[in-house]
Amino acid sequence: MVTIRLARGGAKKRPFYQVVVTDSRNARDGRFIERVGFFNPIATGSAEGLRLDLDRVSHWVSQGATVSDRVAALIKEAQKAA
């Protein structure tokens, strides 16, 4: 099953997440099909905290991809900001 979820990057105690489309059987930070955005939970000041390609997200959802709970909340936030 294809899913849209977060893949963790960054350093110890400084997380940075890529929003990726991947097969649900792959490891969290493993192989992915497409990168559709990023999320920086500790962004401050003028740093960009969230960027999503909403067109690609809607494309994958229309193809049957499931969305994780956290990514669903981020999509809502991005749609509100757009």
From Swiss-Prot:
GO terms for biological process, alphabetical: translation
Taxonomic superkingdom: Bacteria
Ribosomal protein is among the record's keywords: yes
GO MF annotation, one: structural constituent of ribosome
Keyword Signal included in the entry's annotation: no
Keywords, alphabetical: Ribonucleoprotein, Ribosomal protein
GO cellular component: cytoplasm; small ribosomal subunit
HAMAP family membership: Ribosomal_bS16
Protein family: Belongs to the bacterial ribosomal protein bS16 family.
Protein name, per record: Small ribosomal subunit protein bS16
Organism of derivation: Edwardsiella ictaluri (strain 93-146)
Encoding gene (name): rpsP
